Every structure is written in structure tokens, then in C-alpha cells.
Amino acid sequence: MASMGLQVLGISLAVLGWLGIILSCALPMWRVTAFIGSNIVTAQTSWEGLWMNCVVQSTGQMQCKMYDSMLALPQDLQAARALMVISIIVGALGMLLSVVGGKCTNCMEDETVKAKIMITAGAVFIVASMLIMVPVSWTAHNVIRDFYNPMVASGQKREMGASLYVGWAASGLLLLGGGLLCCSCPPRSNDKPYSAKYSAARSVPASNYV
């Protein structure tokens, strides 16, 4: 029962992390730039995401536009788009494996094989965690570097958006969930080892010999 509870907890954390990947990928808040003009009415905030950028006016009005070309994205966001999509696919594969290898499912009968499949699912979730950690941390590094770079104009400096924090949280959940699933070791075989039995040879009475 403890092993089943561990699997359920690991799968739940991994599913939450996978949903976090989708949310981080979809939200246009990877980079946030605030422009404050001389008049507070002209204040606006610019959001940059993987698929679109949005401008939010001080009145609350928001306008979003899809990128015309992938080449218009910075290099880190281009890599982030590819890695995030791959991470979503890998996470979906991990969930499929976790369903097949779950103790509470009847997809397979052999408990040893199911445990090995569950360990594989945990490893897949850990790979998905690394795939999202790389682009999120890379983008955060570039944002911080440009923010403290005196050569970058103040109007072009950016701050880290909510998508980065969601991505870090999703990576942590996937890593923790995958680690819990990897703790599901294959059960020991209940089959007793074969032992040869030897019996002493019976002596033949001498009367049987001619």
C-alpha cells in the first residue's frame, strides 16, 4: 500500500508539473518591459512570450500580436520554444507509461515488468524536467545580464515574467514526481530457488547376482 501511495503521489506531482509546462509555454510573459512616460496615462507594459507579444495599457486594455516570423524571436526564445514543445511531448509519454505501469491499473499482469515501466516513466519525467529547466534558466540569465548592462538603454531593459517562475515550479514538480516513481523498485521474485535433491543409492541383495 505504501508503494502504491508513493506512485499516486509521484504521478500527481508529475501531472501538475506537466500542466505547468503547458501554462508556461502558452503565457506571453517570459519577458516583461515597463515603459513609464512623463504622463501616467501613457504608461504601458510590454509582455513577450514564445508565441506572441502583448501590450497592456494603464487603462487595462491589452493588445496581443502573434510573431510574424520565428526568426523575429531572440535566440534564447527560439531555443525555448523548441525545448518547451519537446518537454510537453516527453511529459505526455511519461504519463502514458505511468498509466501502463501503475499498480492500480490492469494493463499488464507481471508486477516486475510494471515496476520497471514505472521506473522508466520516472526517468522520462526527470528528462522533461531538465528540458524545461534549460530554456527557463537561460532566458532568466539573459534578462538579468541585460538588466545590469549599462550599454542597454533603460527603455529596452526587461524583467523576468511570470512564465519563468511557472516553468521553474513545473520543473521542480516533474523532478520530484519522477524521483518518487523511480523509487518503485521491482518486487523480489516469490519463486523459491531450485534445489536438487539427492537420495542414497539402494543396495542390491547379493542373491540377485548369478
Curated annotation (Swiss-Prot):
Can form heteropolymeric strands with other claudins. Interacts with CLDN8. Interacts with CLDN1. Directly interacts with TJP1/ZO-1, TJP2/ZO-2 and TJP3/ZO-3. Interacts with EPHA2; phosphorylates CLDN4 and may regulate tight junctions. GO terms for biological process: calcium-independent cell-cell adhesion via plasma membrane cell-adhesion molecules; circadian rhythm; female pregnancy; paracellular transport; renal absorption; response to progesterone. This is Claudin-4. Residues 209-210 are annotated as: Interactions with TJP1, TJP2 and TJP3. One of its GO terms (cellular component) is membrane. Residues 1-7, 103-116, 182-210 are cytoplasmic. It catalyses: chloride(in) = chloride(out); bromide(in) = bromide(out); iodide(out) = iodide(in); fluoride(in) = fluoride(out). The modification Phosphotyrosine is found at residue 209. Disulfide bonds join 54-64. Phosphorylated. Phosphorylation by EPHA2 is stimulated by EFNA1 and alters interaction with TJP1. The gene is Cldn4. Residues 29-81, 138-160 are extracellular. InterPro entries: Claudin, Claudin4, Claudin_CS, PMP22/EMP/MP20/Claudin. The chain crosses the membrane at residues 8-28, 82-102, 117-137, 161-181. Keywords: Cell junction, Cell membrane, Chloride, Chloride channel, Disulfide bond, Ion channel, Ion transport, Membrane, Phosphoprotein, Tight junction, Transmembrane, Transmembrane helix, Transport. Belongs to the claudin family. Expressed primarily in lung and kidney. Present in both cortical and medullar collecting ducts (at protein level). Can associate with other claudins to regulate tight junction structural and functional strand dynamics. May coassemble with CLDN8 into tight junction strands containing anion-selective channels that convey paracellular chloride permeability in renal collecting ducts. May integrate into CLDN3 strands to modulate localized tight junction barrier properties. May disrupt strand assembly of channel-forming CLDN2 and CLDN15 and inhibit cation conductance. Cannot form tight junction strands on its own. It comes from Mus musculus. It is a multi-pass membrane protein. Residues 1-103 are annotated as: Interaction with EPHA2. PANTHER family: CLAUDIN. The lineage of its organism: Eukaryota, Metazoa, Chordata, Craniata, Vertebrata. One of its GO terms (molecular function) is identical protein binding. It is found in: Cell junction, Tight junction; Cell membrane.
